[in-house]
From Swiss-Prot:
One of its GO terms (cellular component) is plasma membrane. Keywords: Amino-acid transport, ATP-binding, Cell inner membrane, Cell membrane, Membrane, Nucleotide-binding, Translocase, Transport. The keyword ATP-binding applies. Part of the ABC transporter complex MetNIQ involved in methionine import. Responsible for energy coupling to the transport system. It catalyses: L-methionine(out) + ATP + H2O = L-methionine(in) + ADP + phosphate + H(+); D-methionine(out) + ATP + H2O = D-methionine(in) + ADP + phosphate + H(+). Signal peptide: none annotated. This is Methionine import ATP-binding protein MetN 1. Residues 2-242 form the ABC transporter domain. CDD domains: ABC_MetN_methionine_transporter. The keyword Chaperone does not apply. One of its GO terms (molecular function) is ATP binding.
């Protein structure tokens, strides 16, 4: 478990105090995939680097598995960092070292294992990330996705409890991003690792995360289960991320619907309700007619969800709306 208690970080630049992270409290439960999303300058990288103490907090307390890591001395910090792996946006591989040597680097530096043990561990890691046949290659001979898989193998070398991902997919194409996210999900599931990732892409959060924190200007403005935050955003920053992911311009959509008759509502379904024949049932029971103006069905990690924008006319609308609510469908009246 990772806990932040009123943690903040301020940099001094040209004699001025510049806050990168305002006083922040959060909790990441063990075994979770926890996402932090924000635009450039939001403070997410600072928050991530505070977890493994690459940055020293200006105040507050950081507790990991019951240990106050803000109070560790140099030896304690070195021991703690062996429990935290990290992968980076631009891979940070040594160009003059082979794939196997890059993965072995943390083990070699730790000095706790024989050469034979290191070789065995490296072979295990390369098999896990699907690169057993690339052990003797150099980074220049690899694709971007393969380089990131080497980075993941290296981060797992010391058998960490926590894996930090700093924009790990932002330099990759969509197909490669999907394969890397699938690998991270497998690692989380099979090794019970706690994963904290930062990104500016809502789709990354939607695919792999259990919980999400949305950051803006050094502040966590919204936090919760991904489905709750993604489907029912409360803060303007969160709503912008959701609209960017959906590729929806609400002003344009309102203009498109201006000529449509009736009440316009947006329904959000989750889980089994996504596939239930609710619209037909409600129409028969209440006598309303409906037109589908927009819609999508997708998944948030393992949970299916659907969103429909409807124009409803005729019949008993109040009864129809009550029926939607009774079926645990979130309804938003747009007009």
């Amino acid at each position: 478990m990772i806990e932040f208690h009123n943690v903040h970080k301020t940099y001094r630049v040209a004699g001025k105090e510049i806050p990168a992270l305002h006083p922040t409290s959060l909790r990441v439960d063990g075994g979770q995939v926890f996402g932090i999303i924000g635009h450039s300058g939001a403070g997410k990288s600072t928050l991530l680097r505070l977890i493994n103490r690459l940055e020293t907090p200006s105040g507050g307390q950081i507790v990991v598995d019951g240990e106050d890591v803000t109070a560790l001395d140099a030896n304690g910090l070195r021991r703690f960092r062996q429990q935290v792996g990290m992968i980076f946006q631009h891979f940070n591989l040594l160009a003059s070292k082979t794939v196997a040597d890059n993965v072995a680097m943390p083990l070699t530096l730790a000095g706790d294992m024989s050469r034979k043990q290191i070789d065995q561990r490296v072979a295990e890691l390369l098999k896990r990330v699907g690169l057993s046949d690339h052990a003797k290659k150099y980074p220049a001979q690899l694709s971007g996705g393969q380089k990131q898989r080497v980075g993941i193998a290296r981060a797992l070398a010391t058998k960490p409890k926590i894996l930090l991902c700093d924009e790990a997919t932002s330099a990759l194409d969509p197909q490669t991003t999907a394969s890397v996210l699938q690998l991270l999900a497998e690692i989380n599931r099979e090794l019970k690792l706690t994963i904290v990732l930062i990104t500016h892409e809502m789709d990354v959060i939607r695919r792999v995360c259990d919980q999400v924190a949305v950051m803006d200007a050094g502040v966590i403005v919204e936090q919760g289960k991904v489905a709750d935050v993604f489907l029912h955003p409360q803060h303007p920053t969160t709503r912008r991320f959701v609209q960017e992911d959906d590729q929806i311009d609400e002003n344009e959509q309102r203009d498109d619907f201006a000529h449509v008759q009736g009440r316009i509502v947006r329904l959000t379904f989750q889980g089994d309700a996504t596939y239930a024949p609710l619209l037909g049932t409600v129409a028969r029971e209440t006598g309303v007619d409906y037109s589908i103006l927009a819609g999508r069905i997708d998944r948030i990690k393992d949970t299916p969800y659907g969103q429909l924008t409807l124009a409803i006319t005729g019949g008993d609308m109040d009864a129809a709306f009550a029926r939607f609510t009774a079926a645990d469908v979130h309804m938003e009246v747009l007009r």
